[in-house]
Amino acid sequence: MKNNVIAISRQYGSGGRELANILAEKLGYKLYDRQIVHMAAAQLGISGMSESQLKEFEDNVPPLSLKFMPFYIFGMSGAKPMNHKMFEQESEIIRRLAKDGNCIILGRCADAVLQGNENVCSVFVCANDEYREERGRTVYDGKSVIELNQEDAKRAEYYAYYTGKEWGNPKNYDLSVNTSHKSLEDIADVIIDYINKK
């Protein structure tokens, strides 16, 4: 029997992480988030980096125009830049985790990495600005919608660079859910119902 995998992408402040935790608890699935980054860093020999250093490293996505330039992709020495190696390592880990058992993968372009696998349900989680503003104030240390949107812009840039697709475009996901007007528990039940009928 094939393992079921839920790949969740989410707007900052939409409650996507909390939704992933609820789904993991209801389904008994393992949840993977930042662990994937640390696993990849360990395999690349950069496990000594702090969480903030790894985050800064990830946010440093080169301009899309450089992506197909041979001198950038392989460098003057012929070696790939570390951020390319990091993404490739994370992708390899994601594919392995998807084979190991039922799981939920939060972010990391998992929907694109696992594209074509029939047992994968890709979900995009969004919310209106009022909801995100409230969560920014209460959950994310008083972050404003502007700050949340800046984080989303980084996610969109990262996603576009490594997948060639538009982050958040509903056509790229099996489900898009808006957390603004329903409880996360109810939305989790909708996702579970969809998976059971898929």
Mark where each language-model region is:
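RNA pseudouridine synthases
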Residues: 97, 110-116, 137
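Glycine-rich phosphate-binding P-loop
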Residues: 8-21
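Small-molecule kinase domains that catalyze NTP-dependent phosphoryl transfer to phosphate-bearing small molecules
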Residues: 61-67, 142-185
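ATP-dependent small-molecule kinase phosphotransfer cores
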Residues: 41-102
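Extreme N-terminal starter segment of soluble prokaryotic enzymes
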Residues: 2-5
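Short beta-strand-centered segment that lines the nucleotide-binding/catalytic pocket of NTP-utilizing
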Residues: 30-42
